[in-house]
Amino acid sequence: MATYATPLAGLEGNVIYGKDGSVWVNFLLEGINVNPYNPSKVSSVQAITDDLFTSLSAIDSSDFLILGIKSQIRPEDIMAQCAAGLPGLQDGAYADLVTQLNVFFRKIKSGELASFERLYWLSVAMPVGLTTTEKILGKMVITDPHDGISIKSVRAFNASVMKAIPEKFHARPTTPQHVRWVFDRARLRGLEVPFAPKTPAKGEKPDKAAMKFGANSFPQVNIDQAADTAALTEKFIEDLADRLNERGAKALKSGKSSAVSSFLNNFRSLTSSRMLAIRNLETNNADFPDGYTSHQVMMGIASPPTRTSTAVNSFTYIVDQAIGCDADFALRITFDASAVSKETASKALRDMKSEDLANSRDELDVEDYADDMNNVRELHATVKAESNPIGMKVAALFAFAHPDMDYLKRRAATLSKTFGNAGFTTYQAVGGQHDMWMQMLPGVTRSRLTDDLMMTTTSYLFSGCMPLRKTVIGDSKGVPVAINTENALGQIILWDVLNATDKGNASITVCGAQGAGKSYLIKLLLGYMLDLNRYVYLIDQHKHGEYEVFATTLSDSFVFDVTGRQASLDPLKLYPSEDGTAAQVFMDLWLPLLNIAIDSPEAVALSRMLKHEFRNARKLHSTRALIDYIRRNPVDVSESLSGKFAFWGEQTFCSALIDPVDHGEVINLPPLDAQSHCVVFRTHNLAVYRGNNIAEAEPSERYAAVMYNAIARAAAYRFSQIKGACAFFGDELHFLDGNDRVLDRLIRTPDRTGRKDGNFIVGGSQLASDFGSQYDMIKRKFILRQETHPNAVEALEWADMPATEYLVSRMLEETSPPDPDDNNMPTRGREGEGWFNDGSGNIARIKVLQHLRADRGRMADTTSSRMIRAEELVR
């Protein structure tokens, strides 16, 4: 074992004691959730971050470190989140789901669905007031550098820091094991991402054995501070050997060390490097004698952009983006009111003017000095605009890592350019890489190099960069549906099905062009509903039975062709008679279809005949029986009623409401099976009238409107009898436009009034404009790829996102982009890309997960050349 990056005197709880006499208290913080598509949310995060810096400025310390450290989320923790939303899982309540969750777990373990988070380590130096001599003596172990520091004073300082951190950052003290973890992260950066030690939950007693960790119990590493120089030298020797004859090459090989020394003596600047090679000696093997090597490039920010607003997504947040390499960042902070004073600004301007007069050789030099002076003036103007500015100096350090040194060089150049395009000036310290690496570790005192990189700002101004941030969406428990791709951390987005309505409206809309993955996602949600033994009614009006095909993978489903003589939605069969429900639904469905006014004699006569006592005594338990009774028992309006009913009773497409007659025999269809967990209503043989004058509608079109009303009634009644989540699914219901009453019953009513019963709807459409007023209260929205500018604008606005040209372009060109080498199908691996508004004020870019069952993935595929049609199913 070896020592830490800097010699330690001890580790106790969350306190680091350095041999140089320094004392550091340490806490882990969580980032504030940011919706990057909502300016008001961004402003809120800025205010919260400003509260943190303002509180820290009151602490008696001159050295603060905030380290943004990447941590891998344990697969077990992700599965625990899933299980938390699935009560009864361990007892075998969801047999169909267990196999899928095992597949999901294996994908996480393999790294395919690995998920990460960015934690923030706050380290604050306690003022101890040691002289330089005392610090040196402490390192030489001649004296105890902490002799004059009492445990009581350390505890008091520790408590003051904890109290200063706003609750929204969920601060928790670190442990000695966390120091080992942060060191592991620093040495393994680019090779692997270690799991953070588990922190005891609130009120839970810590494991004392796990808390013990020696100050000299760290893994042994060898740090090559001139990694790129070594590689360059090696390349030179190889090239030289190729140019020599066999004898010369052999001599060069035997005298390699002297050749290297000669090469370095001729090029003395090569002794300083721009890259580190951290060799993890404890992982050595035959292939890697020095152990696995992490190559790291350290960068500092020498100057910020002139307009700091450009820094929001290209500053510290860059480490969470898909930048092609591993990365962390650190902020070394000191608070200094004089740094933003008028006197300091005036002195800076005077110094710059003097330097300008003394050093400028041409107009370009004059321009550079003028730009610097303008920056000072702009900062001073910003400070004056703040009511109570908190002056602070910040040094921003970045570590980029990868196993391949040559690749990392190229990435570092690209990243430096990325910073430059955002207005930042980067500093890749030649010969100072190790110093910068050390500065990104807690317990290490700020160095002169870091002091040189300090930028002057105010707490409010710097908070606008949102250095402590995260973007997470979805529910905190439940089944996995998508990956958060707003950054490269790979958060798994969960859907809490069983408690979906606890937070309010739980309905969902999915919008996407053909081939964007809309129906694939809807079927993913549908599958989970059935896996969790919940109830779903859905309409499938696709002529080839898209959802009928998928229903073959569901455990308890019933496909009901409403024109196919399979079952009955006859209100007199389906609803209870005693409380008047059957009569009410019957009248609501049939009066409009029969063109009977509610104040007509026919309506009154029907009302009397529909009473429970009347029907029960005469055994009128179906509409067909009622029609026959009216025909056989003439009253004043019998002839009129018989004539109106007779037409519909003869139509074959009306079998779901009136029992059909075959060769004079009534076929008594059974009522719709109320026990099925999923009912797929096949309505492909019914066309709906979309005009404004119902009198012009064809008979089948008029009946279709009544049938959809009957389906809505059946769903509402069935769901009202069930405790727990139930949902109505409707894909591409825009064909009902103009039939507001039908849409109200199918969409608006269950969406707005079903929350207390746990009911919600899931609706899909290719175009956002097809979501009418019935969908206005729905907050959870998925939007996938669109193919035209107007459609993209509508989709973004529907999801409560700004339809900027950048987002429209990203929607059209960078969302599941077509692959020209694959017949313009979505690029493999990028299917199902889009955005998700989770209804809680959070929006992020996402990628829909694949079905965890291969058969469901196959049956969900609607690509025209691969789609399985209902008529192809083996019956």
Descriptions of predicted regions:
Residues 612-717, 782, 816-875:
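Conserved P-loop NTPase motor module
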Residues 491-516, 521-527, 537-546, 558-563, ...:
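Conserved P-loop NTPase motor cores
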Residues 515-604:
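Conserved catalytic alpha/beta cores of large enzymes that bind or transform nucleotide phosphates
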Residues 82-83, 96-149, 153, 388, ...:
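Helical/strand "switch-coupling" subdomains that flank nucleotide/phosphate-binding cores, especially
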Residues 290, 421-507, 512, 518-529, ...:
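Phosphate-binding P-loop/Walker A region and its immediate neighborhood
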Residues 2-20, 25, 279, 286-287, ...:
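The Walker A/P-loop phosphate-binding site
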Residues 1-448:
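Extended, folded cores of ATP/NTP-driven motor/assembly subunits in large transport
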Residues 23, 118-120, 535, 677, ...:
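The start of beta-strands in P-loop NTPase/AAA+ ATPase cores
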